[in-house]
Design a protein with these regions (language model features):
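Intrinsic low-complexity/disordered segments
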Residues: 4, 23-25
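Bacterial N-terminal signal peptides
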Residues: 10-19
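Predominantly extracellular/secreted and cell-surface proteins with exposed
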Residues: 79-160
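N-terminal segment immediately downstream of the Sec signal-peptide cleavage site
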Residues: 25-112, 181, 186-223
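An exposed acidic His-Trp-rich patch
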Residues: 135-191
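Bacterial N-terminal signal peptides that target proteins for export
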Residues: 1-10
Length: 223
């Protein structure tokens, strides 16, 4: 974890003191999801992306290796009936407290130039009953709120980057003092993500447009 990522560390401090709070009130000066000209920052000093699964985790415990073990799949996989997940592990520097995922934003992101925010860390999800282990890395959120990542299946890459989810009901904009850029939205399963996962399981387990998570992305603006 980069210690100069003040926004991410502040989020962790708030979490430790008060539990998971609703960060959505931070976005007060939003713009349409097409991102009006001049609102996307050129440079940032870090920040965080918070992913809150839209479903309830039925049981949650901590395994010896630090993984969170539960009977329901979590981000970015929605629960799959008949396919219990045994371990969901946040890959450092991402963390998974209280069933919510926090990813630090790479402070070297240049959203106005590259069109996205790079996230640090990843997630692994294991389905031992099916002999399936999935890892999701190299996450990024584009300036419209769509989510991308690379997927590894049982240690083998299933290809290049794919779009995991489409943005839905996105509210995007700068804070009134222009020091923060926020994306607040709901993520829904993309066609290519559903197709890729269904091939891995050999069955239709994901449906396009399924809700995955609510997202609060807060980036600290330099200029």
């Amino acid at each position: 974890m980069k210690l100069n990522n003040v926004r991410f560390l502040s989020a962790l401090t708030a979490l430790a003191l008060f539990g998971v709070s609703d960060l959505r009130a931070q976005s007060q000066n939003t713009v349409p999801a097409n991102v009006a000209g001049g609102t996307v920052p050129a440079n940032i000093a870090g920040g965080f992306a918070k992913f809150t699964p839209v479903f309830q985790i039925s049981s949650l415990a901590k395994a010896a290796n630090g993984a969170m073990t539960n009977t329901t799949a979590t981000f970015p996989m929605p629960p799959i009936a008949g396919h219990p997940v045994v371990a969901v592990l946040a890959l450092s520097p991402a963390i998974f407290p209280q069933g919510i995922f926090f990813f630090p934003i790479d402070p070297q992101s240049q959203p106005a130039k590259a069109g996205d925010f790079a996230l640090e860390g990843g997630v692994s999800v294991s389905y031992p009953q099916d002999g399936i282990a999935l890892s999701f890395t190299d996450f990024r959120v584009d300036i419209l709120g769509n989510l991308f990542a690379r997927i590894t299946f049982n240690g083998q890459s299933i290809g290049g980057e794919i779009q995991l989810a489409n943005a839905s009901a996105a509210r995007i904009g700068l804070s009134p003092d222009k020091t923060q850029f926020t994306i607040i939205e709901t993520l829904r399963v993309s066609n290519i993500f559903a197709e890729s996962i269904n091939k891995i399981f050999g069955a239709t387990v994901l449906t396009p447009n399924q809700q995955i998570a609510n997202v609060d992305l807060v980036a600290d603006v330099i200029d």
